Amino acid sequence: MYYRDFIITSIEAERILAMKFDEAFAGVKNNAIDTLNQMGNGITRASYYTSCLMNNYQDVCSKLKQEDTRFIAGLAQLVKNRDIIFQMIKIYIETYFQNKKEEKAQNILKKLVGAGVYLSSAVLTNRILIMAVATMICQTSRFNTVVYGRINRARSLVLKGSVTATAVVLNVYGLIQVAANSADNLKMHNSFYYNALYANHLEMMYFLIEPVITGVPYLNPMIISDDELAELLIKLMR
């Protein structure tokens, strides 16, 4: 009986050990794939710069240079002012309140409270409601998991995935390309929010919160109803 139990225990231990090795190798594999994809994006972006040598593609060249400059400007804001993540969420909510009169705040507040969202009844203006909702969104575990996960992943790909100066450049360029793609997608699907971020030099940082924003349906800020806005905010706060 003892030997049988010992054999079963040994087999189980080997199975667990094999699973741990599989997990470890899967992690290494995924990191390697992410790094290669990032460098691939960097190579793609670097190849776009050949357009600067052709007279017919100066508009492409100009767009690339502008994206690089605005990415660096956004990154500088992120380093100096960690509040920009909150600012981007606040700006997003503001776009939906731009055509809402002040008295609408209480109506929307009642709908949020009725859905189980805890907000102070002292909220009287759109501005205060926007600040309160933006704060609650930024405090949700899902939001922090997504945003900080993206920040850490970007930092890891640039630093840990780079063993040479060339790799550093390609990884940074890859990150800029990811940011540019996200900004372009936003411009195509939600021009109101894109323009608001652009005015604040933050559109190239949008990629950090993109999964949060695309996780809720897009609604036209010009015609959104109070019920639709309340439902949108509730989804973001959960």
Regions found by a protein language model. Name each.
Residues 1-111:
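Terminal export/targeting leaders at protein ends
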Residues 79, 93, 97, 113-116, ...:
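Generic secondary-structure transition motif, activating predominantly at the C-termini of alpha-helices
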Residues 7-18, 192-200, 231-235:
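N-terminal amphipathic/basic membrane-interacting segments and domains
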Residues 8, 29-68, 72, 151-217:
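Membrane-engaging insertion elements
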Residues 83, 87, 103-106, 119, ...:
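Generic alpha-helical secondary structure signal
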Residues 113-182:
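Membrane-inserting effector segments that mediate pore formation, membrane fusion
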Residues 57, 62, 124-135, 213-224:
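Short, Lys/Arg-enriched charge-dense amphipathic segments
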Residues 202-238:
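C-terminal assembly and membrane-engagement modules of membrane-active proteins
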